[in-house]
A protein has these predicted regions:
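Hydrophobic, aromatic-enriched interface-forming segments
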Residues: 140-157
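Catalytic-core regions built around general acid/base machinery
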Residues: 45-56, 126-137, 192-195, 223-228
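A broad helix-preferring feature
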Residues: 62, 74, 172, 176-180
């Protein structure tokens, strides 16, 4: 039997969720690039941020998200600035490498077909940007995980659309992320993940307007976990989600991350003992 997938948590994406309050026991962490690494910040500022991140005593930081963030950064459409994207991407991968990140999530919402803009040209831009990502990823042995996100005005809204795009791109550094909630959004069968197991390198999960365990979604988690077990997936399954208090009052992030970890661990143990 393959090793189980790893339980991962996104950190540092909102001020009401202090990373230092994350409960122990999570097996890996996911860093939001544009928020915590901000490639437009000076290297001196980055050194201070690295020290701050180290002080949080997080699990190994192996994944990332929020690759483009603010500053007018776009990957498709009339507003693309290639010089800006090149600087951002180069420095982002340098900083991700320092943290020992191995999987870089890239959101499908960055690849919209803007109103009045040629879809063919947008696709050419997307291919150019993803080749740029792959070039920098190759330098550090990093894998890029494209995240189809269910919006029909994007170039690859569905997981299988993303798979076709990644295959057309033809770069071994570029694979896919499976986000459970975006599968549900259109909807799409989770079994699509198993059509090309080697392409799935990261997963996102959430609850019903909150963290996993909020709402009645246990059957869906179990279905996803069984698929991941069957394909031998050993990457991260990341709680990348809004967080709410399940006990009333202000959010106690330490309490909720501990509760969610126990919930997910119990479900995973159930699946891997079958």
């Amino acid at each position: 039997m393959p090793d189980p997938f790893k339980l991962c948590i996104l950190f540092g994406d909102s001020p009401d969720r202090p990373p230092q309050q994350i409960s122990p026991g999570w097996e890996m962490a996911e860093v939001p690039v544009g928020i915590q690494l901000d490639p437009f910040q000076s290297n001196a500022n980055w050194a201070a941020k690295r020290a701050e991140i180290a002080s949080w005593n997080l699990p190994p930081i192996k994944a990332s998200s929020h690759f483009l963030h603010h500053y007018g950064l776009v990957a498709t459409g009339p507003g693309v600035d290639w010089e800006q994207l090149e600087f951002w991407t180069k420095r982002a991968f340098e900083r991700l490498h320092v943290l020992d990140v191995t999987t870089v999530g890239v959101y499908g919402g960055f690849f919209r077909v803007r109103e009045g803009f040629s879809r063919v040209e947008a696709m050419d831009q997307a291919l150019r940007f993803c080749n740029m990502l792959a070039d920098h990823a190759r330098l550090y042995g990093i894998t890029v995980a494209l995240e189809p996100m269910g919006d029909l005005d994007t170039l690859w809204p569905r997981y299988l659309d993303g798979l076709a795009f990644a295959r057309e791109l033809g770069r071994s550094e570029v694979r896919l992320m499976a986000d459970m909630n975006y599968f549900l959004k259109l909807p799409q069968p989770l079994e699509d993940i198993a059509k090309a197991p080697e392409y799935c390198v990261h997963c996102h999960i959430a609850g019903d307007h909150g963290q996993p365990g909020v709402g009645d979604m246990e059957a869906i988690y179990l279905r996803l976990f069984r698929i991941l077990k069957d394909i031998g997936y050993e990457g991260g399954v990341s709680a990348a989600c809004p967080w709410v208090s399940t006990v009333g009052g202000m959010l106690d992030f330490g309490l909720e991350t501990s509760k969610t970890l126990r919930y997910l661990r119990d479900l995973r143990d159930r699946v891997y003992s079958e």
